[in-house]
């Protein structure tokens, strides 16, 4: 992992539960201070450093504002990088994934905007439950494997949520 720590950049304790409004406010404050345009008349070295600080800040913000990315980052901070691609040995979740994808495909085939809205609400509830479960166990070494499983589920639901938003946009047109 690169330094500095994403949480330290925002003067936050490394925790899963964050106040996203506070994070966004702090991001805007910090971004104003390191924005490369403020260093347009500075020597080239200072311009480059400002660009690097701005890029680091943006990366940190994107990581911390996304629950799945924040979960992966916290797990990595605790000692082990979690591989991006890994075979999932979670038959129950694999079945759930297949069912959710089939449901979404049916909604697309039927062009059912109301059904998509319901699906989206159910997905949000599932994401919130996963977030709460992860928050309760991520920092416990004895539950490391469970935390990784939850993080992978979070990643899947996040990707599915993105697909739902894309479907909504297509059906709205």
Swiss-Prot record:
Residues 5-77 form the J domain. The keyword Chaperone applies. It comes from the Bacteria. Pfam families: DnaJ, HSCB_C. InterPro entries: DnaJ_domain, HscB, HscB_C_sf, HscB_oligo_C, J_dom_sf. GO terms for molecular function: ATPase activator activity; protein-folding chaperone binding. Disulfide bonds: none annotated. One of its GO terms (biological process) is protein folding. Keywords: Chaperone. The keyword Membrane does not apply. One of its GO terms (cellular component) is iron-sulfur cluster transfer complex. Belongs to the HscB family. Co-chaperone involved in the maturation of iron-sulfur cluster-containing proteins. Seems to help targeting proteins to be folded toward HscA. PANTHER family: IRON-SULFUR CLUSTER CO-CHAPERONE PROTEIN HSCB. Interacts with HscA and stimulates its ATPase activity. This is Co-chaperone protein HscB homolog. It comes from Pseudomonas syringae pv. tomato (strain ATCC BAA-871 / DC3000).
């Amino acid at each position: 992992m690169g330094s500095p720590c994403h949480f330290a950049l925002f003067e936050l304790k490394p925790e899963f539960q964050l106040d996203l409004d506070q994070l966004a406010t702090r991001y805007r404050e910090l971004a104003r201070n390191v924005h490369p345009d403020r260093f347009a008349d500075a020597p080239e070295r200072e311009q480059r450093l400002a660009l690097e600080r701005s890029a680091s800040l943006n990366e940190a913000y994107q990581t911390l504002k996304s629950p799945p990315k924040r979960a992966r980052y916290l797990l990595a901070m605790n000692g082990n990088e979690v591989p991006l691609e890994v075979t999932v040995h979670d038959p129950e979740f694999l079945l759930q994934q297949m069912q959710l994808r089939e449901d979404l495909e049916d909604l697309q085939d039927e062009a059912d905007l109301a059904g998509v809205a319901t699906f989206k609400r159910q997905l949000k509830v599932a994401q919130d439950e996963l977030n709460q479960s992860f928050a309760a166990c991520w920092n416990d070494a004895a539950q490391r494997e469970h935390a990784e499983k939850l993080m992978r589920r979070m990643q899947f639901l996040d990707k599915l949520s993105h697909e739902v938003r894309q479907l909504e946009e297509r059906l709205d047109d």
